[in-house]
UniProtKB/Swiss-Prot annotation:
Lineage top rank: taxon: Eukaryota
Protein name: Tudor domain-containing protein 5
Lineage: Eukaryota, Metazoa, Chordata, Craniata, Vertebrata
Organism: Ailuropoda melanoleuca
Gene: TDRD5
Family according to the record: Belongs to the TDRD5 family.
GO biological process: P granule organization; spermatid development; transposable element silencing by piRNA-mediated DNA methylation
Length: 982
């Protein structure tokens, strides 16, 4: 039995025991309360996949029986089984106390009347009351922005209007009756979260869907006099009206009123009382449906509005109608009090007396008197007026099919006939609003956008690109999309990049999977243009992706660019959705790259070379070393460390004859022709990325946990080691750390160093010979002391040398313009054996910015001093060449710890390193807030050399660079490290 089945079986027993112990049963609310009191936790609805208590009990027909009552309440009673029949019979024989009965009745009354009512509602008639126009206007105003869940309705209403919704004072018993009374403007849709209240779409949209069916025409059955009263004695010829049974069904009955009012009364008197009431109700419904919203306005108010508009024969701007009305009649005209959302909806309802036009050059609609003839300029051939519904059009106009036929499909000579018929009887047929054909397209799109587009949808925003990486930065990467070795896209693999992208995609899937949200964020046709940022769902994997429209292929398909993965694909227009603004904070994760220091053997890459490169990349994380940027394209070295031997891609391509290794990066031709990322995105704001700061994550600089510089190599040292070590790639390097290397709140290196370089650098980098010239004394305000080693090689065939390869510490000192002196001390080492540590991790102290490296060197012929030296560096960076190191503090093991240290000038450093037992590099804390850096070299390294990592935290793990070092057995855990004090 699974865990879910066990929980469900236990829940069935608990619910049966609760309901059996209650003779009169419990309501769903009381059941939830009793369960909480008995068990101490709420009903496990979500665990079992239920949305409500009623859904849970309905799924237990053998445990619970549901007993609905006439007042709307529901009582749940238990169905006893074989083991509980005796208990149920005993409970049934109990005497019911009056106190319990009265409390149950009070509970039912409170459920029926709702939370907003605590007093007894007086008795009323059979029919529910009519919702006041002011209340209906408030409901429309509340739902105009976005749909609201019924459970959140009370909070939203209080937040919007500052008071609770007291539906009892309007004569309603429940919110259900309120929604029924407002069914003409509010629709209720059942969702997974509950009942969702939505504002109904305009009648024009419903008519465009084909309602009423068959193109039946509706005309007003009762003629309205000029004063607004109905004529009861005059006959009405051939007037029709229908009985709409529901909002979505077509009319089923067509009653022909062809006789006088007296004959109708005689005919209806033969029917029984029920049929009379039904017929009268249907008649009223039909008349109200045909009159439209304008029928609720009093005739006097209509006359006043018409009088105001008639004073402006050239047209009155619709925005000035309320002000002119107040000036003339000294009273305010409030559309909301009349039940309308705004003045446009009010004018649309009064289309039997008003006419609306939109002219080029005008920023607003013009309102005219319906009986006044339009001015001659409006009758020109270029400005043909067409009928269009605005806001809430009246229902007593011609159907959509008839309007389309008379305005678009009919010849121009027949187009004036319906106009003449309508002008003869302005009070019978409500004239729809009229707009010109040649409306400014941008203005129309703007109006549609403001009305239909969600407020948090992205319209013209661009994504940011990731900030540029520093040279020699170590990153874990995924190769996402490959065109050739000179044109591919990578994605950074780290906690602050790939995991953020995964979290965002999960949130997007959860958001857009809701059908209501998906429909609301549908991308309209006029937004589908190149460069627009949106999102799309791939039907194969059901995930949602951020995309940028690249090209429109036709009526149904578009070509999109995926800024997080780099590829271009074809999708359907119907699958495009607006992207929410919250999903634009994460920068585009794809980085256009080119493999560094390689070029094809021929002019272009062969298919075999591309296939081989694809096999090397695969679907696995790789280690990348940043070389440089060429025309905005990242040139990077790639290495696969998943096997015992490190596989360098440039070496494999060269070995198989697909590429030529060169010492310079050739610009990518493919990215020169097309680089969608540079075309559709913008550069980031800087190293301290503001976007990620807003998200609450570390800055974009922390994506890579590293800041590096390249230690320059002198030409003389390059020549001295050229014969011993083959040319190749720089070794992977260590990274900067703070108090704890895994602390996400450490500051970037640039923030600590400042612009003037007034503090010692924290960088320990590998040298890259010939990459950058070493600065002279004129270029440096203070002297730099650089510890550099020979150039290391990225080659699978390279192994550490035997006993003759030792530790080389080379000191470069500037004596004059370009003069250099070298003092080298060497010790011979063997391959270090593994070291095991049994110390408790909690006893190990944390190190602050503590670095060390494995130094490849050669023994010097010069003598040595037996005492160790301590170097206090000036306020310039100290650079140390390293082998492949991890992102954690490390030190060289020493059997004997010599802590002696003296200050020495640059001239006294000439022969210090040949026999140094310990070298400590630190800064005086009195001159700055920087902590010390320590490098410990013990005499033990004359026999063997080991690279150790202190276990500063229990959750420490090796980074990408350290994995490269461990593959060569150059890295071991350090048992204990003592902090060096200045």
């Amino acid at each position: 039995m699974s865990e879910q089945e066990r929980v469900q079986e236990c829940l069935r027993k608990e619910i049966r025991s609760l309901l059996i112990s209650t003779k009169d049963g419990l309501t769903p609310q009381q059941l939830e309360k009793e369960y909480l009191l008995m068990v101490g936790s709420h009903l496990p609805l979500r665990i079992l996949g239920y949305r409500s208590t009623m859904e849970l009990v309905l799924d237990m027909p053998d445990v619970v029986t549901v007993c609905p009552y006439g007042d709307g309440t529901v009582i749940l009673r238990a169905i006893p089984d074989e083991s509980t029949k005796g208990i149920a019979s005993l409970v049934a024989k109990q005497r019911s106390s009056h106190k319990v009965r009265n409390s149950a009745q009070k509970g039912r009354a409170s459920v029926c009347s709702g939370p907003s009512s605590r007093r007894q509602v007086p008795y009323r008639g059979r029919l529910p009351p009519i919702l006041p126009a002011v209340v209906k206007s408030e409901l429309k105003d509340l739902l105009a922005l976005s749909p609201i869940l019924l459970s959140d309705f009370e909070k939203a209403f209080v937040r919007r209007f500052g008071r609770s919704f007291q539906y009892v004072q309007y004569g309603f018993f429940s919110m259900f009756e309120v929604l029924n009374a407002a069914s003409d403007v509010i629709s209720v849709e059942q969702t997974r979260a509950g009942s969702l209240l939505m504002l109904k779409k305009s009648v024009s949209e419903e008519k465009q869907r084909g309602w009423p069916a068959g193109g039946k025409m509706f005309t007003q059955p009762f003629r309205m006099k000029q004063q607004g009263s109905y004529s009861t004695g005059s006959p009405v010829a051939k007037a029709r009206f229908s009985q709409p049974t529901s909002n979505m069904e077509p009319p089923k009955q067509i009653l022909n009123v062809e006789k006088t009012f007296k004959s109708n009364v005689v005919e209806t008197s033969r029917l029984n009382h029920t049929e009379k009431l039904n017929q009268l109700e249907n008649t009223f419904k039909s008349v109200i449906a045909q009159i439209g919203p304008g029928g609720t306005i009093s005739p006097e108010l209509k006359h006043k509005i018409r009088f105001v508009v008639s004073k402006f024969p050239e047209g009155l701007l619709i925005s000035k109608l309320l002000r002119e009305f107040e000036i003339i009649f000294k009273e305010q005209l409030s559309p909301k009090k009349l039940g309308f959302l705004n003045v446009i909806e009010l004018v649309g309802a009064l289309s039997d007396i008003l006419r609306v036009e939109f002219r080029e050059g005008e920023q607003d609609l013009l309102v005219f008197d319906a009986d006044m003839k339009p001015l001659p300029p409006a009758q020109s051939d270029k400005k043909i007026e067409v009928k269009a519904y605005v806001s809430s059009p009246p229902r007593n106009s011609l159907s959509t099919a008839a309007v389309k036929e008379t305005t678009w499909d009919c010849p121009p000579k027949n187009r004036k006939e319906p106009e003449q018929k309508i002008c003869k009887k302005p009070n019978l047929v409500v004239k729809p609003l009229q707009l010109q054909v040649e409306v400014n397209k941008s203005q129309r799109n703007l109006a549609m956008a403001n009305h239909d587009i969600p407020p948090d949808a992205v319209r013209d925003k661009k994504l940011c690109r990731l900030p540029l990486l520093d040279t020699s930065t170590l990153v874990g990467v995924f190769v996402e999309y490959i065109i050739s070795p000179s044109q591919f896209y990578i994605r950074i693999y780290s906690r602050d990049s790939s995991e953020l992208l995964e979290d965002m995609m999960i949130e997007m899937r959860r958001c857009y999977s809701n059908q209501l949200v998906s429909d609301r964020y549908t991308l309209p046709e006029y937004f589908i243009q190149p460069g627009h940022l949106c999102c799309v769902r791939i039907s194969e994997d059901k995930w949602w992706y951020r995309v940028i429209i690249h090209r429109v292929l036709g009526k149904q398909e578009v070509e999109v660019f995926y800024p997080d993965f780099g590829n271009i694909g074809t999708v359907q227009k119907s699958s495009l959705r607006f992207l929410k603004c919250c999903y634009t904070k994460l920068p585009a994760q794809a980085i256009p790259c080119s493999l560094a220091w390689v070029r094809p053997v021929e002019e272009h890459w062969t298919s075999k070379a591309i296939l081989q490169f694809q096999k090397l990349c695969g679907l696995k994380p790789l280690v990348g070393v940043v070389d440089e940027y060429v025309d905005g394209i990242l040139n990077i070295f790639l290495c696969d460390t998943s096997s015992n031997e490190d596989v360098y891609f440039h070496h494999v391509l060269r070995t198989e004859g697909h590429a030529i290794v060169c010492r310079e990066n050739v610009p990518s031709k493919g990215f020169r022709e097309l680089n969608p990322l540079a075309l559709y995105t913008k550069s980031s704001s800087g190293p301290e990325d503001v976007v990620l700061t807003e998200l609450g994550y570390p800055s974009q600089q922390h994506y890579f946990n590293e800041d590096r510089e390249i230690s320059p190599q002198s030409k003389e040292s390059e020549l001295s080691t050229l014969d011993e070590i083959p040319t190749g790639m720089p070794c992977l390097e260590s990274v900067t750390i703070g108090d704890d290397v895994w602390d996400e709140n450490w500051l970037p290196l640039q923030a600590k160093m400042g612009k003037g370089g007034d503090a010692a650098s924290h960088l320990f980098t590998s040298s890259l010979g010939g990459k950058k010239p070493y600065p002279s004394c004129k270029e440096m305000p203070q002297k730099d002391w650089c510890f550099s080693g020979p150039k290391d090689v990225w080659d699978d065939s390279w192994q550490p040398s035997g006993l003759m390869n030792g530790v080389k510490v080379e000191v470069q000192k500037q004596e004059g313009l370009g003069a250099q002196e070298k003092n080298t001390g060497t010790t011979r080492i063997q391959k270090p054996p593994p070291v095991e540590s049994s110390l408790d991790l909690s006893t190990l102290p944390k190190l602050e910015e503590f670095y060390s490296s494995l130094i490849q060197s050669q023994q010097s012929a010069e003598g040595s001093q037996p005492e160790p030296s301590c170097i206090q560096t000036p306020a310039k960076p100290v650079q140390l060449s390293t082998a492949a190191l991890s992102a954690s503090p490390m030190a060289l093991d020493s059997a004997e710890k010599h802590s002696g240290s003296v200050e020495s000038s640059p001239e006294s450093l000439k022969n210090d390193f040949s026999s140094s037992h310990a070298i400590t590099v630190f800064k005086d804390k009195s001159h700055g807030a920087m902590d010390q850096l320590s490098l410990i070299l013990s005499p033990e390294h004359q026999i063997s050399q080991k690279l150790y990592i202190p276990r500063s935290t229990a959750t420490a793990a090796l980074g990408a660079a350290a994995r490269l070092a461990t593959s060569r057995s150059l890295l071991h855990w350090y048992p204990s490290v003592k902090r060096m004090e200045a």
